[in-house]
Amino acid sequence: MAAGMKGKRSRRRKERKNVEHGCAHIKSTFNNSIVTITDSVGNTLSWASAGGLGFRGSRKSTPFAAQMAAETAAKVAMEHGLKSIEVYVKGPGSGREAAIRSLQAAGLEVTLIKDVTPIPHNGCRPPKRRRV
């Protein structure tokens, strides 16, 4: 770095987008749930995850944690003027339905629910079975 320069980065203030319709992408795995709300183009408005909200360990994978993540993401997205969403659900986790219900309860109108879980046509070898 130059002699007079400090390690300071100028941070741009987030501009307030005004979006009526968007998409909610819910990724629910066996270990965590991530909710991302985007506009119709795909630019992220807000996101939240169960782990980011302070849930740790086995509590991260609960439906309640997914519900809280969806609620948090919905509140921030509604500040951008969001009113209706299409929901895309991915993964086998337990928080799928809870997250969708939470988005509806937050005051967003759900226009479409679609399962976009990737299904292999005999691709990679799955992990070995757990023996407990």
UniProtKB/Swiss-Prot annotation:
Feature: compositional bias, Basic residues: 1-16
Region named Disordered: 1-20
Keyword annotations: Ribonucleoprotein, Ribosomal protein, RNA-binding, rRNA-binding
Gene Ontology BP terms: translation
Protein's job: Located on the platform of the 30S subunit, it bridges several disparate RNA helices of the 16S rRNA. Forms part of the Shine-Dalgarno cleft in the 70S ribosome.
Quaternary state and interactors: Part of the 30S ribosomal subunit. Interacts with proteins S7 and S18. Binds to IF-3.
Classification via PANTHER family: 40S RIBOSOMAL PROTEIN S14/30S RIBOSOMAL PROTEIN S11
Protein name: Small ribosomal subunit protein uS11
